[in-house]
Regions:
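Perimembrane helix-loop-helix junctions
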Residues: 225-263
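Signature aromatic-anchored transmembrane alpha helix within multi-pass, membrane-resident enzymes
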Residues: 187-188, 201-202, 395-429
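Hydrophobic, aromatic-rich transmembrane alpha-helices
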Residues: 93, 320-347
Length: 586
């Protein structure tokens, strides 16, 4: 593996044609976010998530480990985002290294530039990027670890192939290795017996499982990334490479061996997590969308699940750019699978293609709930792989045109590569837009909170409990920036289709993002029974008495504020406590 990384660095990653575009796209997408302070949901959650027991009770002890090792404090936005960008660039480079090993070490730098840049700019990551406590640092680091573990495993596979098939090893690195290592293919006469190599293989697979344990213990959305990437490896090795295995079942046995580290990691995760709960005397709890909903599933809920998934990951392509890119990639990938099936006279490309498609929504298959965009990070890997496949196709056109001395294929191939780079830039621009909007949301909320806190400190007795009621709004400008207006044909069509599917009123504007640009004020005074609202106010330099109240406990205070006719930003001294209306009471 060390020699592979050195070779890849010298021939690909160290070339200006690779790292200059990588830096250009990365800082175009994330530079503003890294260099500007933004406080949002979860950002002040370190005292609860890491120092307290929230993540431990949710079996996310790996996330605690990440924060303890790589972050320093409750809210260090520049450091967390800087490290996140570093991990994300390393993850993109590791993903390209994986492709470099898969394709027989082709030295076409632009292939890997497109794969890396399209991966790290896919805009769905904006849903978790600003969560500097729970997502920003952890997810990019997990991506990097998973890709490096798979590079290591694939290195062992190709090394095993080389030792078991000297003729194939002698043919040179330019020809793809035959996909029979760690599988049940027919052995070469010089190959050692399976009984002799099995202990070494088992040790490698178990070691990979141990390394992956803290990674999949960070968040539920990480394990599907491993599954999707493994299926991509199998698809490329057994459907794209021209050499075919000696046994049709070779792909299955290789897939089983890739599954062993994941199963090992899951088992170790549960053993360690429940051991921690037992030692600390804690109970298992769920935070966020982590519950298994299949147990209470009925026909009506199942229909709602199917409709929700179809709307979010199909119909939404009419208005939501990252979903548009995903749907186009999915359609083109499906056509590629069909063509490969016809050409190879085998159903394997279609079968593995379906498996890849299902793996993208593995969270829904496991939990029985509509997959939120913030957990749909498998789409980043899938779309980057499809971009890479078409970059390969365009290079094939260029080579064919040069060999046959025809200008049109060369021109078409080069235009195709430029188009992929352009779409990658559009992804970066879209990502930057919503991260910048989130910064504007922070500026607006900061102005509101500073004015409210100053008024309280000068005109009221702040030793009394402060009760915050209502739902904050960032105003019409922010609303129309994060919702589809319906004025375009695509927007109007989306609303009509959505209405026919689930009955949502046509006038209701759909969100373009689910997590980004969400109100920090609402989060801190509602979530975790308002236990973080005091921390939120202290962030602005004020130490007030803010009691922790559950949603149910807030209801009578909301009703009281409505009865008083309070408007947004009104303050009322009620004798024993002070009511602060921060938004709509509806």
């Amino acid at each position: 593996m060390h020699s592979l990384i050195k070779e890849y660095t010298d021939k690909i990653a160290g070339r200006k044609a690779y790292w200059i575009p990588l830096l250009f796209y990365t800082f175009g997408a994330y530079g503003f976010s890294m260099l500007n302070r933004t406080l949002g949901a979860d950002d002040l959650g370190t005292p609860l998530y890491v120092n307290d027991t929230v993540w431990l009770q949710d079996l996310r002890w790996g996330a605690v480990l990440w924060k303890k090792l790589f972050s320093f404090g409750s809210f260090v936005p520049f450091l967390d985002k800087f490290l996140s960008i570093c991990f994300l660039m390393l993850a993109g480079t590791a993903f390209s290294c994986l492709l470099y090993l898969l394709n027989g070490k082709r030295e076409r730098v632009l292939l890997y530039t497109i794969a890396s840049c399209s991966f790290l700019t896919f805009p769905i990551i904006c849903e978790i990027w600003e969560f500097t406590c729970g997502g920003t640092l952890i997810v990019p680091g997990d991506f990097f670890c998973i890709f490096m573990i798979l590079v290591w495993l694939l290195c062992r596979i190709t090394a095993s192939e080389a030792s078991s098939n000297p003729q194939n090893a002698a043919s040179g690195a330019s020809s793809p290795a035959r996909p029979q290592a760690l599988s049940a293919g027919r052995r070469h006469p010089r190959q050692s017996s399976s009984a002799a190599i099995l202990p070494q293989q088992a040790a490698v697979l178990l070691a990979a499982g141990v390394l992956m344990t803290p990674v999949i213990s960070s968040a539920e959305s990480i394990a599907p990334v491993y599954v999707t990437t493994v299926l991509i490896i199998l698809f490329y090795r057994y459907c794209i490479q021209r050499t075919s295995p000696e046994r049709k079942s070779a792909w299955f046995f290789e897939g089983v061996r890739f599954a062993i580290p994941l199963v090992t990691a899951f088992a170790l995760r549960l053993i360690i997590a429940y051991s921690i709960l037992a030692v600390l005397g804690l109970e298992r709890k769920h935070t966020g969308a982590t519950r298994i909903e299949w147990f209470g599933m009925n026909a009506e809920k199942f229909a709602a699940l199917i409709k929700g998934m179809f709307i979010n990951y199909g119909v939404a392509s009419l208005i939501n750019f990252p979903i548009t890119v995903f749907v186009i990639c999915a359609v083109l990938f499906a056509l590629r699978c069909i063509l490969l099936t016809i050409r190879r006279r085998s159903a394997l490309p279609v079968f593995l293609g379906i498996c890849i498609g299902l793996s993208l929504f593995l969270i829904t298959l496991i939990q029985g709930s509509v997959m939120l965009y913030r957990t749909a990070i498998t789409l980043m890997v899938f779309c980057a792989f499809v971009f890479y496949l078409f970059a390969e196709t365009f290079y094939a056109w260029i080579n064919a045109g040069i060999i046959n001395r025809k200008t049109l294929p060369v021109l078409a191939g080069r235009c195709g590569l430029v188009f992929l780079l352009f779409i990658t830039w559009r992804q970066a621009a879209h990502l930057h837009r919503f991260l910048a909007l989130n910064n504007l949301r922070y500026d607006n909320e900061t102005a509101v909170m500073q004015e409210i806190c100053y008024t309280l400190s000068t005109d009221y007795d702040t030793s009394k409990p402060l009760i915050f009621v209502g739902n904050f709004s960032n105003g019409d400008a922010m609303y129309y920036s994060t919702h589809d207006s319906g004025k375009t044909r695509a927007g109007a069509m989306y609303r009509k289709i959505r209405h026919k599917i689930d009955g949502t009123p046509v006038w209701k504007s759909p969100l373009l993002v689910q997590s980004t640009v969400s109100s920090a004020i609402d989060f801190y005074h509602e979530e975790f029974d308002g236990r973080l609202m005091g921390e939120y106010i202290a962030y602005y330099g004020y130490d007030f008495n803010v009691p922790a109240l559950s949603r149910d406990e807030h209801i009578p205070y909301n009703e009281e504020a409505a009865g008083l006719g309070m408007k947004p930003f009104n303050i009322a001294d009620r004798g024993d406590y002070i009511l602060i209306c921060i938004g709509s009471l509806d």
